[in-house]
Amino acid sequence: MNPRQIAATLLALLLTTCLVSSSANPDEAASEGRPITPAGSLVQDLTTRQAAVGAMPVDFVRSPDKLGPGGAGRFLLAVNSGHGVQFNASGNRGQQSIAVIDLNAKPAAVVQNVYFPSPQSVNVGVVFSPVAQEDGSHSLYVSGGFENKIWIFQFHPANQRPITPGSPGPNTTVEAPFIDVTGFASAANSPRYNSDRAPVYPSGLAISSDGNTLFVANNLGDSLGIIEDLRLARRLTRVDLRPQNQEHFVYPYSVAVLNESDKAYVSCWNDDSVIVVQPGRAKIVARVTVGRHPTGLLLNAQQTRLYVANSNDDSVSVIDTTTDKEIERISVRFSEGVPPGNSPEGLALRGDDLYVANAHSNSVAVVELSDKGRSKVRGFIPTGQYPSALAVAGRTLFVGNGKGTGVQNSSMIVDNSGRVPNGPNERFPAGTGRAAGQGGQYSVALVVGNISAVNLPDDPALARYTQQVMRNNGLLGPRQARLFPAASPIRHVIYVIKENRTYDQVFGDVEKSGDGTRADGDPSLAIFGGGEGAARPDGEHQDITPNHRALALRFGLFDRFFVNSEASPDGHNWSTAAFSTDYVDKAFRWNYSRRGRTYDFEGFNRLPNYEPLRGSPSLFGPKVETEDVANFMRRFIPYLHGSRDVSEPETLYLWDAAARAGLTYRNYGEFLATLSEADVEAIRKNRTKTYPDVSPTVSAFATKKSLEGRFNTEYRNFDMDTPDSMTVDSYWAARETSGRTSAFINSSHVDARYRGNSRLGVWLEEFKTFAAERAAGAADRLPNLSVMRLSNDHT
């Protein structure tokens, strides 16, 4: 078989990490290719007179007064801790918020929004002081996340807008007093990590029954913070939650406390445990093993049971708070024996029924609890996309749909259309553009959440809901046809991952696929195509991506391929694992909205910026060697230290699936660390390197154990200075010689000016070796799966 024949057996999959449909038909599938049929109705906002908007609701909190339905609290607070909404396109200040729902309104409606423009935060934790003040108001404590603050608001339940001081947006900031919790830090702040804030990042909150002690889950501090004498001296005590392995990061998230305040429970995202702390002694008294990635915590009314949502395990752990033992683990999957993927996050209780928000299956599991450890799932309720928070008030279930039920082309508009936007561009929203201050909004801000109010179903209604959920998730109805009914004839897959391009930007003007089937695209958006959308301003025709189009027409045009990602972090996880975990979905939004943290989503955990940073001294000094930098980076790869990557899904990655199937695989650029000769020299000089970096790769190592020995050590990971294939100069040189010299930068280029490292050059050299061996009659060493990352599509 000659090289041309080998190439003809390849299946080249060209994807972007934010592919979405061009259609706005509400009957068509939304992200992930599944229809959404949310039960109930959307909660309205009385200010805007349209559906209330929230950026990734993560919790609901009921007010402690007795002025509401049934003599319970009048208000329900939705805690919106995602990237944040964007009021207009003039800036990128993602505004998190607290939405105040008046349960006395008919129907319940949002009557106040308190906005926290970045870097301000409402980060997961919101609690009321249970003790009312003389005027009937309550203190309201709110985690400030990145800024290491605990905000203190006053809540007046008799008022129509109960929270003071307010921040109604769009150009307001929170002016409430706060408690500085930087004192919980065990490490100094650095401009190279967490945007120069001390690594504390308060998240979940709980408060003692007397209202005088606050408990804080410090997500980057790996600790429980205790603030005693809350009204006066405010003494801070830190309880380290790490195990003996101090290089194991546990990421505390939620906290719950018993009324007697003799025990506090902390869910730790990366420890598979709920840690029990005795506050009086500031000491850990138990570690209760639960499922992978424990997230939400909920105590029953008697505080005898603690329910724990295990997001990466598709389960809920039940802990006996007397013995601090897990007495039951309830599966909330659709059936046993299937891989995890529901991602339970939010919890709510009503009597003996536990409601569990399954974020990735767009459903709420209804669990009938049993004291004898025989709890069972009664059925499922359909929701919007990514249900991430739940509350029950009377006979109404409130569902925070983290990614909404359909959005238009502004982060301030949500609806029930089932539509997702086709990426930001100048026309969005249609007919307005930038002149109206709405066009061109950021993609992560566009995908926002909303709140559904659902009447609790009786048994027949729950049965109908369950069938709908099963249909939505492809478990009922016609079976989808397999690409190949029998054994696949495909021997090799070369999976090319690019990003920051929508389908329509590249293929929107392709009229038909290779077999003649009409393609579904919008040619006006095809700015990287070959039609009118790609024409120069003077009207001159351009054909910008002929190779992409040739591959798509030969091997497959995925015009109906849906991916539930909005940016690089979740995009690379969807691309390589077909999943994005709770950690990725939450933490990347905080990071991308300029609320600190670091890029934790491709195998590193808490890696500081080791590269030259303007205004900061070098981490290493002028005599640093390559291995010094490499060893520093290895300190932040969890598997090298007996730990787990907090971002890692239980089903792992495509290459792990290949290994389980007995297939060979090789990786080019994904989940790797690389250093070039120019990188090391730039670190020595503490000066940013210049484009293009075609210098040799001098160090390369995997961030996943299953990639050890399975990657090309010359191929670079993400780096905007290393060319994917060519530079402008090498391209023009090739044109000037009518193609007699290659446009690709490679190590054996005939022109010394273009000799060096490019991603395509490295891959092509290795591929030619595989092809030559096969042509010479040797065994076929081309891997069954090749994963190839091309990162230079960023604009």
Regions found by a protein language model. Name each.
Residues N2, E228, Q278, D320, ...:
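Alpha-helix initiation/capping motif
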Residues V447, L462-T795:
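N-terminal pro-sequences and low-complexity stem/linker regions of secreted or lumenal proteins
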Residues L10-L11, S21, F507:
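A periodicity- and composition-biased signal for non-globular, repetitive helical segments
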Residues Q5-I6, L236, G351, N717:
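Positively charged, low-complexity intrinsically disordered regions
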Residues L14-A481, A486-A487:
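Predominantly soluble domains enriched in secretory-pathway, periplasmic, or organellar proteins
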Residues I6, A51, P64, W151, ...:
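Small/flexible residues
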Residues T9, V43-T47, T173, A552, ...:
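A short, polar/charged loop/turn motif at coil->beta-strand junctions and beta-hairpin connectors
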Residues M1-L10:
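Bacterial N-terminal signal peptides that target proteins for export
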